[in-house]
């Protein structure tokens, strides 16, 4: 569930989300290692936190590429409060870092954070910044400060053990009107700095309590929405993906007796029979003008 709204005469906006089930679904769909669960989980939470601020029909993609062993993590959200995502190396594991925590920064390494905002126009808006920590939350805050000139704070956490995802969530606070009094800015910064980690915070407090601790007072009107893991892949799109292959590749699949397309976003497998591949090959013949 995501909670969102504004404070201080709409000069500050916030979102806070708990999405353990969503991250657990991602873990199961992609058969993720512990570390990969934390990395993708953090990215999905980051993408979820911006959903209340998206334009209608907007698709927002967080794409992080680094020189670490996970190589790439991609999370996408929509204005309908859905998320989906994947990592390039779902089985990555590393020793715990010096703080005894999952080494997310080590898994990602040095690299770039790219945001793609697709508003349904001809060309999506793409912006890129260098990674400042590889921990994802700080990188998102840096992106908003540099690319969108919005002072932001993000805090994101995923707790996972042998039984699965225990806690997954985070919050984002953004100053969208620079006329906000300096003492309020300093108060928010101080309160956020004094909060424990998300994993600990969500064990001891409910989202509305966390917001009260951030802003120093009870929040007024708060909207809510359910975050869901949802992919828009289907069999027809999978078939079109096969049609992109050259004729020889399709013929090789037909000889093997079947063809398979796996969606990178949700790991759904679409299997096509020898007969279906025969039909697709006819399209290839027709395309060639024969």
From Swiss-Prot:
Disulfide bonds join 231-233, 263-266. Its main location: cytoplasm. GO terms for cellular component: cytoplasm. It is found in: Cytoplasm. Under oxidizing conditions two disulfide bonds are formed involving the reactive cysteines. Under reducing conditions zinc is bound to the reactive cysteines and the protein is inactive. CDD domains: Hsp33. GO terms for biological process: protein refolding. Gene3D superfamilies: Hsp33 domain (3.55.30.10), HSP33 redox switch-like (3.90.1280.10). InterPro entries: Heat_shock_Hsp33 (IPR000397), Heat_shock_Hsp33_C (IPR016154), Heat_shock_Hsp33_N (IPR016153). Keywords: Chaperone, Cytoplasm, Disulfide bond, Redox-active center, Zinc. GO terms for molecular function: protein folding chaperone; unfolded protein binding. Belongs to the HSP33 family. Redox regulated molecular chaperone. Protects both thermally unfolding and oxidatively damaged proteins from irreversible aggregation. Plays an important role in the bacterial defense system toward oxidative stress. This is 33 kDa chaperonin.
């Amino acid at each position: 569930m995501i909670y969102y709204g504004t404070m201080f005469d709409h000069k500050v906006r916030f979102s806070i989300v708990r999405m353990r089930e969503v991250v657990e679904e991602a873990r199961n769909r992609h058969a993720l290692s512990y570390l990969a669960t934390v990395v993708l989980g953090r990215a999905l939470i980051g993408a979820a936190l911006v959903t209340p601020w998206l334009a209608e029909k907007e698709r927002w993609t967080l794409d992080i590429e680094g020189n670490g062993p996970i190589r790439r993590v991609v999370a996408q959200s929509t204005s309908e409060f859905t998320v989906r995502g994947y990592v390039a190396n779902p089985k990555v594991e590393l020793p715990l870092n010096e703080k005894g925590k999952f080494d997310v920064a080590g898994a990602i390494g040095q690299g770039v954070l790219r945001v793609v905002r697709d508003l349904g126009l001809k060309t999506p808006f793409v912006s890129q910044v260098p990674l400042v920590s590889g921990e994802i939350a700080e990188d998102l805050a840096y992106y908003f400060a540099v690319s969108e000139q919005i002072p932001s704070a993000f805090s994101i956490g995923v707790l996972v053990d042998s039984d699965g995802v225990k806690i997954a969530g985070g919050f984002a606070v953004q100053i969208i009107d620079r006329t906000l009094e300096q003492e309020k800015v300093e108060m928010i910064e101080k309160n956020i700095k004094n909060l424990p980690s998300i994993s600990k915070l969500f064990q001891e407090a409910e989202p509305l309590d966390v917001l009260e601790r951030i802003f120093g007072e009870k929040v007024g009107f708060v909207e809510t929405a359910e975050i869901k893991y949802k992919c828009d892949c289907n069999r027809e799109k999978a078939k079109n993906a096969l049609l992109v292959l050259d004729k020889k590749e399709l013929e090789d699949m037909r000889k093997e007796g079947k063809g398979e397309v796996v969606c990178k976003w949700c790991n759904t497998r679409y299997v096509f029979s020898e007969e279906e591949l025969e039909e697709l090959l006819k399209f290839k013949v027709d395309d060639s003008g024969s």
